[in-house]
Amino acid sequence: MADVKKVVLAYSGGLDTSVILKWLQDTYNCEVVTFTADLGQGEEVEPARAKAQALGVKEIYIDDLREEFVRDFVFPMFRANTVYEGEYLLGTSIARPLIAKRLIEIANETGADAISHGATGKGNDQVRFELGAYALKPGVKVIAPWREWDLLSREKLMDYAEKHAIPIERHGKKKSPYSMDANLLHISYEGGVLEDTWTEHEEDMWRWTKSPEAAPDTPTYIELTYRKGDIVAIDGKDMTPAQVLAELNRIGGENGIGRLDIVENRYVGMKSRGCYETPGGTIMLKAHRAIESITLDREVAHLKDELMPKYASLIYNGYWWSPERSMLQQMIDASQVNVNGVVRLKLYKGNVIVVGRKSDDSLFDANIATFEEDGGAYNQADAGGFIKLNALRMRIAAGKGRTQF
């Protein structure tokens, strides 16, 4: 890619991407535009501006994407009750398509002919960033330094930074032994002692949540109001999507909710252990299934459950911008038209317990479902014919001697 003139770099301001910035300038003799996204990671993003300026960057983008992230990516994903491999709520995966989108938008605005990212050659993020970029701008060039250079250790990165006078923080604060990634939906931890699948994670690793043992001894009750499958209010107070998730993170974290320790199957072929804190997302998943339980038709709910693993894999593997994900999303969104109402939850020492749900669009009919006298709302004698018709094929097979014993 010797003809690269301008590159948009996904820039955090940390050691890795600061080294990448200088490496791009030296290796490709190109202009670098930096893009730093505020996705609610809880860290100040403005210092990235000063670091980029110190490295000679003229065009610097620092964007607050929290509302767009939750409104256009997190909420649509939760309408599907999305879980990867039964447990993972896709906190990292769902952030990547937005970053890819913004990288391409900035490339178009600035006339850049390439984008670059700091994802390693071992992980899923390289796939997610690049699939998104190619889907949105087929001819874009992508530079992935971790697949090109020989700076394959933190020590080598530090040496490069010192040699090239790259500004890096040196202070007495203890650095986390884990590789961490955070946004408004979750915080992830990988590496360190977690690479031994038998070793228990350390309690002081967790940043957002109290341990269930240290959580309050009295439960916290909350009410979530839904409109078309999305939460619009907590305890009757209207909130924006980002405000909803931030508040649920706070409440959930106080009650020890949302910790996860899993070994997942990466798209690139390896197994990887990760620990995740997703307090707000854990609450949202439980509550959304509760409001759907009274507002969705049975077959619609079951079909959604059958399609969800495919939808989850598409997001995990980086296919958010694919036509098949878009097709599934349209179906999912159509199912949410009547998913309105209120869910009441009890949060207690790591548990999310549904204690009530109500909706003007509820399909629950107490007159039919009652165990008491129903006044003729349901004729129990009808069940006999229903059962016989559904047993017909099995009765015929049994009559031919095709029994199971």
UniProtKB/Swiss-Prot annotation:
Catalytic activity as recorded in UniProt: L-citrulline + L-aspartate + ATP = 2-(N(omega)-L-arginino)succinate + AMP + diphosphate + H(+)
Positions annotated to bind ATP: A10, Y11, S12, G13, G14, L15, D16, T17, S18, A37, G118
Pathway membership: Amino-acid biosynthesis; L-arginine biosynthesis; L-arginine from L-ornithine and carbamoyl phosphate: step 2/3
Sequence positions that bind L-aspartate: T120, N124, D125
GO cellular component: a single term: cytoplasm
Biological process annotations from GO: argininosuccinate metabolic process; L-arginine biosynthetic process; urea cycle
Record keywords, A-Z: Amino-acid biosynthesis, Arginine biosynthesis, ATP-binding, Cytoplasm, Ligase, Nucleotide-binding
EC numbers on record: 6.3.4.5
Class in the EC hierarchy, top level: ligase
Keyword field contains Transcription regulation: no
Chief location: cytoplasm
Any single Pfam family the record assigns to this protein: Arginosuc_synth
Record-stated family: Belongs to the argininosuccinate synthase family. Type 1 subfamily.
Record-linked PANTHER family: ARGININOSUCCINATE SYNTHASE
Protein name in UniProt: Argininosuccinate synthase
Organism of this sequence: Stutzerimonas stutzeri (strain A1501) (Pseudomonas stutzeri)
